[in-house]
Amino acid sequence: MATLEQKLEELVSDTIESMGFELVGIECQRAGRFLTVRLYIDKEGGVTIDDCSDVSRQVSAILDVEDPIADKYNLEVSSPGLDRPLFTLAHYQRFIGQEIVIHLRIPMFDRRKWQGKLESVEGDLITLTVDNETRQFAFGNIQKANLVPVFNF
């Protein structure tokens, strides 16, 4: 059975791509009775507020017609930001060499949160260097992952 995120991606990805954007990913977060649907978009050269607004209008129209969400919800459209979320294996592949933080579904060595340098992606295994040790994580066990912003002053 498809998740809500997968259903939404099927509904809106073609429209977003036809507008010249990459749909980086979708997050659905519940807070009490309300649901926040967050779409991350990107394009070469970055995303502006006007871009987010345009995509939001188009996606809202699709969701109004298709009505895939039974509950009340807020739609947010944004750029991935400095702490860009990683949703797919291709995202991990793209950012090899970068510092990332991952949150696991099932703890490994009594830890759910790991931060380290992304070394490789082989099949569905993600390899990080954490505290000078190599650790491998199954992609399916990663609940959430983000780039760690680097500030050079």
From Swiss-Prot:
Cellular component terms (Gene Ontology): cytosol
SUPFAM superfamilies the record matches: YhbC-like, C-terminal domain (SSF74942), YhbC-like, N-terminal domain (SSF75420)
Keyword annotations: Cytoplasm, Ribosome biogenesis
UniProt-listed InterPro entries: Ribosome_maturation_RimP, RimP_C, RimP_C_sf, RimP_N, RimP_N_sf
Gene3D superfamilies: Ribosome maturation factor RimP, C-terminal domain (2.30.30.180), RimP-like superfamily, N-terminal (3.30.300.70)
GO-annotated biological processes: ribosomal small subunit assembly; translation
Compartmental location: Cytoplasm
Pfam families in UniProt: DUF150_C (PF17384), RimP_N (PF02576)
Main function: Required for maturation of 30S ribosomal subunits.
NCBIfam families xrefs: PRK00092.1-1
HAMAP family, sorted: RimP
Similarity field: Belongs to the RimP family.
PANTHER family on file: RIBOSOME MATURATION FACTOR RIMP
Name of the featured protein: Ribosome maturation factor RimP
